[in-house]
């Protein structure tokens, strides 16, 4: 597999956690949280990040119930993933995000989850599924 830069998104209607990673290092790290009231502002900032980091692929967390079923937030995450692909022509992968906020809380040692850390957890899970070179 060729080296790729990846951006991951923990999508929420009020804020979006973003992480960055690389298939060569197989490491993900939190990048930032977008707090934007409007869709235009959100996608404007995402466009800036895409231009800055030049990722080959995006990973979007897919919220599922504990038993693996889709829920109302799943449709919103899928719509966001489709918008990323449609607006920016970016390849997008959906990844089960169950437990990512709890894992982020454990990593931070706090009860408040950081959405960028949750995005890094989601991206790390994706990187861990890739075949070894």
Swiss-Prot record:
EC assignment: 3.1.-.-
GO cellular component: cytosol
Keyword rRNA processing assigned: no
Keywords: Cytoplasm, Hydrolase, Nuclease, Ribosome biogenesis
GO MF, any single term: nuclease activity
Disulfide bond entries: none
Family from the record: Belongs to the YqgF nuclease family.
Name this polypeptide is given: Putative pre-16S rRNA nuclease
Organism: Bordetella parapertussis (strain 12822 / ATCC BAA-587 / NCTC 13253)
């Amino acid at each position: 597999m060729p080296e790729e830069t990846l951006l991951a998104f923990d999508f929420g209607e009020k804020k979006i956690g973003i992480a960055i990673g690389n298939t060569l290092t197989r490491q993900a790290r939190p990048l930032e949280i977008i707090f934007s009231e409007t869709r235009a502002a959100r996608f404007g900032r995402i466009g800036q990040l895409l231009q800055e980091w030049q990722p080959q692929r995006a990973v979007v967390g897919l919220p599922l119930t504990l038993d693996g079923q889709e829920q109302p937030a799943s449709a919103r995450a899928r719509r966001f993933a489709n918008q990323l692909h449609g607006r920016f022509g970016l390849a997008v992968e959906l990844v089960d995000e169950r437990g990512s906020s709890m894992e982020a809380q454990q990593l931070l040692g706090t009860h408040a989850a950081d959405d960028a850390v949750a995005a890094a957890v989601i991206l790390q899970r994706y990187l861990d599924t890739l075949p070894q070179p």
